[in-house]
């Protein structure tokens, strides 16, 4: 290095370590419409001031590192750095704070959920100055939203494709999830669809195993779809799981589904990865396929209250990356989910514009502009007695998915499907007549069961089944 170069590099540079808050804690900062905003729940190590912890989060997830570097002088840190602009204590929790961080839009690649998450939730979650860190919410500015395709089709286009309006869609996950041959699997699909369901589904871990290779399954399922459509006069579908070990194999499976003429496929978007998921979503839009998203692995990330990432963030990521459906809990079933919290991220999936509402866990107003909405899927431990509550909580623009609640019917799969369809239509009719499903729901189901033996049998089997556990992830 020449003396001249050394002199230029050294101008204004002072080596050493300085507090993050001197650069990255800026309570006077006024956020811009183009900023990506993040709300982090942070638990600093003993002795670490919350301002220093919040600034460290902003620094390590944007331009900062642990020491001063001379190359800071070669760019404009004020333009590119993340800023912790507000900190508030969490009520009822000792040494927990919500840190609000603003990121300039230029830090992120357009149309890339992968890059967005690599930056914001990358290395910072292992930072030693923090005992725990959780990303509670993100505000994605319209200028960044518009760089994404989002869902392949969206709610209205899906309804038009299926020619089904004014009620929740009904589905069923085929069980046992592993071990069936392709022919028996297709038989189970056919029975459910002819009984009145709109969809059946591969479980998340059904890929291409020795007992049932993917192509065999796709062929038998397609036969079941077309046979049930011919019998019922309704459009039917099965979420054939295209998730695979490579993106190339995933797209090959999607191409097979397209050639068979089926309406929908499925992807495990967390285990499959955001890059693969976005590629698949683009393929689905180009080729007229609906895309169902399973959230397998989400609880590893979102279950703990003080560390990880809330599902509302993963839900927003799925809308950006692309999916027409995504699993969203049930509130009343066997899986985790508080009602107000669930309603918050369900609205974030479906609506064009969502106001800030901390009572529902919504930290920021979100404008999705032209991005299509996503149907929330209620699935996991639900049965006919849950139908009134599910109809009230999720409304018409949803998929209510009964696996054991269909296949566990004492008379078989088709009667199980009939029971769910009758219960759903009874609840929709009662709601449309002005009845209060929260108060009269059980009576609505009992009345419908008087003229439906299939529903009456289902009511008897599941009359005592409840999943009454305390929710871990509360507001």
Swiss-Prot record:
Binding locations of substrate: 123, 173, 177, 295, 327, 379
Compartments in which it is found: Plastid
N-acetylproline modifications at: 3
Enzyme Commission (EC) number: 4.1.1.39
Xref: PANTHER family: RIBULOSE BISPHOSPHATE CARBOXYLASE, RIBULOSE BISPHOSPHATE CARBOXYLASE LARGE CHAIN
Active-site annotation: 175 (proton acceptor), 294 (proton acceptor)
One GO molecular-function entry: monooxygenase activity
Keywords: Acetylation, Calvin cycle, Carbon dioxide fixation, Lyase, Magnesium, Metal-binding, Methylation, Monooxygenase, Oxidoreductase, Photorespiration, Plastid
Family per record: Belongs to the RuBisCO large chain family. Type I subfamily.
Originating gene: rbcL
Keyword Magnesium set for record: yes
GO process annotations (BP): carbon fixation; photorespiration
Catalytic activity, as annotated: 2 (2R)-3-phosphoglycerate + 2 H(+) = D-ribulose 1,5-bisphosphate + CO2 + H2O; D-ribulose 1,5-bisphosphate + O2 = 2-phosphoglycolate + (2R)-3-phosphoglycerate + 2 H(+)
PTM sites of type N6,N6,N6-trimethyllysine: 14
Name of this protein: Ribulose bisphosphate carboxylase large chain
Enzyme class: lyase
Biological function: RuBisCO catalyzes two reactions: the carboxylation of D-ribulose 1,5-bisphosphate, the primary event in carbon dioxide fixation, as well as the oxidative fragmentation of the pentose substrate in the photorespiration process. Both reactions occur simultaneously and in competition at the same active site.
Names of the cofactor(s): Mg(2+)
Residue numbers covered by the propeptide annotation in the UniProt entry: 1-2
A Pfam family annotated for this UniProt entry: RuBisCO_large_N
Marked site (Transition state stabilizer) residue numbers: 334
Complex formation: Heterohexadecamer of 8 large chains and 8 small chains.
GO cellular component: plastid
PROSITE patterns found in the cross-reference section: RUBISCO_LARGE (PS00157)
